Amino acid sequence: MSMLKPSGLKAPSKTIKHGSTLLKAPASVATAPAEKAPSSEKSSSTTTADAHDDFVDDFRVGERVWVNGNKPGFIQFLGETQFAPGQWAGIVLDEPIGKNDGSVAGVRYFQCEPLRGIFTRPSKLSRKVLTEDEANGTQTAHASRATSPTSTSTASAVSASPAALLPSGIPQKTSPLAAKEHSTPSQFSNLSKTASGSVSNLSEAGSLKKGERELKIGDRVLVGGTKAGVVRFLGETDFAKGEWCGVELDEPLGKNDGAVAGTRYFQCQPRYGLFAPVHKVTKIGFPSTTPAKAKTTVRKVVATPAALKRSPSASSLSSLSSVASSVSSKPSRTGLLTETSSRYARKISGTTALQEALKEKQQHIEQLLAERDLERAEVAKATSHVGEIEQELALVRDGHDRHVLEMEAKMDQLRAMVEAADREKVELLNQLEEEKRKVEDLQFRVEEESITKGDLETQTKLEHARIKELEQSLLFEKTKADKLQRELEDTRVATVSEKSRIMELERDLALRVKEVAELRGRLESSKHIDDVDTSLSLLQEISSLQEKMAAAGKEHQREMSSLKEKFESSEEALRKEIKTLSASNERMGKENESLKTKLDHANKENSDVIELWKSKLESAIASHQQAMEELKVSFNKGVGAQTAEFAELKTQMEKVKLDYENEMSNLKLKQENEKSQHLKEIEALKAKLLEVTEEKEQTLENLKAKLESVEDQHLVEMEDTLNKLQEAEIKVKELDVLQAKCNEQTKLIGSLTQQIRASEEKLLDLAALQKANSEGKLEIQKLSEQLQAAEKQIQNLETEKVSNLTKELQGKEQKLLDLEKNLSAVNQVKDSLEKELQLLKEKFTSAVDGAENAQRAMQETINKLNQKEEQFALMSSELEQLKSNLTVMETKLKEREEREQQLTEAKVKLENDIAEIMKSSGDSSAQLMKMNDELRLKERQLEQIQLELTKANEKAVQLQKNVEQTAQKAEQSQQETLKTHQEELKKMQDQLTDMKKQMETSQNQYKDLQAKYEKETSEMITKHDADIKGFKQNLLDAEEALKAAQKKNDELETQAEELKKQAEQAKADKRAEEVLQTMEKVTKEKDAIHQEKIETLASLENSRQTNEKLQNELDMLKQNNLKNEEELTKSKELLNLENKKVEELKKEFEALKLAAAQKSQQLAALQEENVKLAEELGRSRDEVTSHQKLEEERSVLNNQLLEMKKRESTLKKEIDEERASLQKSISDTSALITQKDEELEKLRNEITVLRGENASAKTLQSVVKTLESDKLKLEEKVKNLEQKLKAKSEQPLTVTSPSGDIAANLLQDESAEDKQQEIDFLNSVIVDLQRRNEELNLKIQRMCEAALNGNEEETINYDSEEEGLSKKTPRLFCDICGCFDLHDTEDCPTQAQMLEEPPHSTYHGSRREERPYCDTCEMFGHWTADCNDDETF
């Protein structure tokens, strides 16, 4: 409350004024409006004025009187007032039990202290004290009005000095508060504020009345401040009392077409007509209803709610009475307004509208100043009240301090008495405690000894049993050790026999080596000089095979030595363990004997200790009894004054005894617990002993198992060595067979080419497996490096042997002449074999064509799959869009629910504030205008919300339908794709089976050809024995190399089997990843084994090719002998062409290898993609289930929406039932709404952007999911193919796998790499989009919360008292029905265009009948002439 503007009123002087002067000031103030008032008002108040003139003549200013016969005081004012017509008397009371300080509604009539002034009718004054009966007799008739809220609720105003106004010589009571008020000179500036709120009320009402009267038919008007239209009707109606204005609106926002309840008042289109009270209709451009005025009135009401509650002015009284009358008699509110406005409009005739507005504003400012003065008066009252309370507090504190001192003295005395008694008690208790301790110690020792004795006895028994068990276990272990030694001896004998067998096999090998050497010598003598090149290559291969054989022998010896070492080490370990077990048994026997001796000693000591403690216990008990008797004697000899204390001591002794007994029982329990613990410990020791024995037994069993496993391993290894030796023997025998086949190796070219192709296909499969197992590359590189080193050594040896072979071949040229004769027969066989080769080649080409067709079919299926993936991606994107729409609708529903909650809260607050507003509201008509406008806005908002809710429901239904349709489409598409995939798989499987059948037929033909070839070779062997001996040496060398390679293969296979066993053992303990690693290692080793096999096959093929070359050269020599030298040149050209073909085949083979490596990489990538696709397929299924759940939730939400609608309807009914005038203006709420709408628009724009990003992210996710599903399917196909390849790899090498599958796998690998790259890119994009979505969702939530809490943020600038009122929303009120909270006047169903009968009104009287109204009380129910003038103000 800082500096305020000067009011223009002079402060009253401090000197005492006489009655004559006092009468002039208010009279002048009162006469001014009285002169302006028309004669009609004078006629209404003459009766009351004349009735009081007699009383005024009797009394004079300064005379001592009693108000109502019981309130003494002095008359300070006599005359007319502004707050009510007629003569009034202003009295200064002796005590502060009045209602003001001489001023009412900002007009000062006299001056006195606060709460000492009162205005009353002169008829209520008396010059002497009246009895209660007399006072009651005068007041019974008008008790109801005397105690009305308007009379009792008038509060005090600004404080001032009372002595200044009282006449001299009059005794006066002054309180300390009054003295304080005299000393504050600043309060004199606030003494007189002449502008009144009542005048502002009246001027406002008058201006409104003028506005009403200025309305004409055809004027442009605003109904409720928002609906524009043209006046078509003015006058009274049948559906409600009062003047009504029928308006034809510009937009279809009305309720009818000019007719209500069957009677037509004007003509317009349907929903363009609207009826409203005249005071709610404003002419466009009318100055009295400006927004600025509305704001100031609202600010005035909100600023001082507390002051108005306590001390309303005369204007507030008049407004309250008008509001009360409007509430009590709803249909006649307009009549009240018209009458009051007509009464006050006569005073303001002759002035323009602008002057009236200025006056209204000045009066409003003055009323605010008056209210500030009232607030200051309240503060002064509060300070005086606080002073009085402080004095009372001081008195109370003094009394409290005295009482505290007295009580402290008493407490000191009592403390001394208690301390003396406590000392005696403590001494006695100490003695008792000492004796207790002694007894407890003795009992505890006795119990300990008994427990230790029992424990020792149990321990002895247990140890005896344990000794017996250990002796039995020793005997058992000795028998086991004997058995183990016997088994060791048996294994040694077996090893010796196996060693002798190995020696025999080695001798056989030496003999075979000698035979090979002899064959070499024969070959050297049989070969011709022209075969230098071929013999060199053969010798090189023979030397390489010999080296491999030597290496294999060395490795075999190493393995044998390592096995021997392992066996010896295991034997030593077993012996050591047997020794440790025997030593531990001996120790246990010694420990048992020591324990027995200890037990005997402990038993003797326990018996001695028990006897000693028994004697001590008896002596202690006797001494304790004596002490107790002495204490009893001392108690009996005490003084009579201490009998009470002794009685207390006895009770304490009994308590002590009880405690002692409890402690004894507790000790017994403890002892029992300790016994149980000891027993448990003994049992634990027993368990430990058992565990030790079990562990020893387990160790023995483990040792036995180890021995058995070692023996088994040794036996297995010996069996393997024997098998290897047997295989070597078999291979030696096979070498003899192969020596016979050497001359006919030219016929094997076709078969070898087929084998080469089969090996190439298997190499491709193996390469794919090698690429899948990426970790096996390191081992393969190491092996390749070793192979390269071996090849370098072989090349060095070959260069050395070439020089030697050139010399040896010169002597062999002569033998070739003999062979020319036999070549003619061989050529015939060769021709037949070539024909068969051509047939096989044709079959191979047909098989290749079939594979190409299969590849084309696979490509077509892949294209179909891609198309279906795109369709699935589109469907998933649509599903995600629907999901986003669902989420948006759910958020909107939540916002609507929150708005409804806010409205209900506002309703509750408004209901609570109705009573306060009824007391404190001043300008009821203006406020009702504002509140009606606010209520209309709220109704429109509710209608908008309902429309939005219906739209949201429709959208939710549409979304549900769309989701169901999309889900059905997705399911149908998935089923169709599954069916197509299954059909394609069946087709592929049929093709594979056909290919297999073709391969089997080709293999059977190949076997038949082999059989024929073997028969023919067996026939040719007899003829060419001499030539075969020369080739035997080469074959032996090659077979030795094969043996070495096969041994290596066998060793690697055994290692692989061991690794498999280890993997199976590790499955229980390790995870799947370790198992996979071990399996990968095993596969790597298998790949290495296969590579070595392939290398050996390649070396064999090279040797065969060299043989073929030799045979070709022999053929050429025969042709030279039979034919001319020209034929020899032709044969050489043919040989060159064949060599070129072989080289081309080699190049193609290498290219195929590279392609296989690439495809294997692609296969691995595809497998990874398949895994991801499988995961995404699972996610998609989860999303389908989530969609179903969302649909269920939607149905639940729809049900909730219906319930909410029902609640809204019920809430509207409740709101219509309780409606009152509100204080908050729509300007603040509209500004807030515009701000929030702007913020909402911004948020919606952001949401649209986010939705676009979400849609893109979801489309990417759907693409990834489809790719992952394809990947899973491809993985399944790859697994099936791998299983088939494994099954085929177990078959002989001659079996060829279909090339069509390999080609399909290659294509899949290429597409898989591209898909993997796309998936990685899409995953990165999806992660970024998800982050953005999360951030933007957080922003949206914050903005929504800010939007919901916006009203609270806007009202922070108001005072703490205004915060509660600023949140309140206006209540609906209908002027036609006179009901609150149901609907607004513009939305009243009675004026709606309906064929139904009009509803019954709540007013049951005749509408044409004029109701009685009192101008003084401003209430309905009686006329002004019948009013009791006993009221006070």
Swiss-Prot record:
<feature type="region of interest" description="Disordered">
    <location>
        <begin position="133"/>
        <end position="208"/>
    </location>
</feature>
<feature type="compositionally biased region" description="Low complexity">
    <location>
        <begin position="32"/>
        <end position="49"/>
    </location>
</feature>
<protein>
    <recommendedName>
        <fullName>CAP-Gly domain-containing linker protein 1</fullName>
    </recommendedName>
</protein>
<feature type="compositionally biased region" description="Low complexity">
    <location>
        <begin position="140"/>
        <end position="168"/>
    </location>
</feature>
<dbReference type="InterPro" id="IPR000938">
    <property type="entry name" value="CAP-Gly_domain"/>
</dbReference>
<feature type="compositionally biased region" description="Low complexity">
    <location>
        <begin position="319"/>
        <end position="333"/>
    </location>
</feature>
<dbReference type="GO" id="GO:0035371">
    <property type="term" value="C:microtubule plus-end"/>
</dbReference>
<keyword id="KW-0479">Metal-binding</keyword>
<keyword id="KW-0966">Cell projection</keyword>
<feature type="compositionally biased region" description="Polar residues">
    <location>
        <begin position="184"/>
        <end position="204"/>
    </location>
</feature>
<dbReference type="InterPro" id="IPR036859">
    <property type="entry name" value="CAP-Gly_dom_sf"/>
</dbReference>
<feature type="zinc finger region" description="CCHC-type">
    <location>
        <begin position="1412"/>
        <end position="1429"/>
    </location>
</feature>
<dbReference type="GO" id="GO:0008017">
    <property type="term" value="F:microtubule binding"/>
</dbReference>
<feature type="domain" description="CAP-Gly 2">
    <location>
        <begin position="235"/>
        <end position="277"/>
    </location>
</feature>
<dbReference type="GO" id="GO:0005634">
    <property type="term" value="C:nucleus"/>
</dbReference>
<keyword id="KW-0813">Transport</keyword>
<keyword id="KW-0963">Cytoplasm</keyword>
<keyword id="KW-0968">Cytoplasmic vesicle</keyword>
<dbReference type="GO" id="GO:0001726">
    <property type="term" value="C:ruffle"/>
</dbReference>
<dbReference type="GO" id="GO:0051010">
    <property type="term" value="F:microtubule plus-end binding"/>
</dbReference>
<dbReference type="GO" id="GO:0030659">
    <property type="term" value="C:cytoplasmic vesicle membrane"/>
</dbReference>
<feature type="region of interest" description="Disordered">
    <location>
        <begin position="1"/>
        <end position="51"/>
    </location>
</feature>
<keyword id="KW-0472">Membrane</keyword>
<dbReference type="GO" id="GO:0005938">
    <property type="term" value="C:cell cortex"/>
</dbReference>
<dbReference type="InterPro" id="IPR032108">
    <property type="entry name" value="CLIP1_ZNF"/>
</dbReference>
<feature type="domain" description="CAP-Gly 1">
    <location>
        <begin position="79"/>
        <end position="121"/>
    </location>
</feature>
<keyword id="KW-0206">Cytoskeleton</keyword>
<dbReference type="Pfam" id="PF16641">
    <property type="entry name" value="CLIP1_ZNF"/>
</dbReference>
<dbReference type="Pfam" id="PF01302">
    <property type="entry name" value="CAP_GLY"/>
</dbReference>
<keyword id="KW-0175">Coiled coil</keyword>
<keyword id="KW-0863">Zinc-finger</keyword>
<comment type="function">
    <text>Binds to the plus end of microtubules and regulates the dynamics of the microtubule cytoskeleton. Promotes microtubule growth and microtubule bundling. Links cytoplasmic vesicles to microtubules and thereby plays an important role in intracellular vesicle trafficking. Plays a role macropinocytosis and endosome trafficking.</text>
</comment>
<feature type="coiled-coil region">
    <location>
        <begin position="351"/>
        <end position="1353"/>
    </location>
</feature>
<keyword id="KW-0677">Repeat</keyword>
<dbReference type="GO" id="GO:0008270">
    <property type="term" value="F:zinc ion binding"/>
</dbReference>
<dbReference type="GO" id="GO:0031116">
    <property type="term" value="P:positive regulation of microtubule polymerization"/>
</dbReference>
<keyword id="KW-0862">Zinc</keyword>
<keyword id="KW-0493">Microtubule</keyword>
<feature type="region of interest" description="Disordered">
    <location>
        <begin position="319"/>
        <end position="338"/>
    </location>
</feature>
<dbReference type="GO" id="GO:0031122">
    <property type="term" value="P:cytoplasmic microtubule organization"/>
</dbReference>
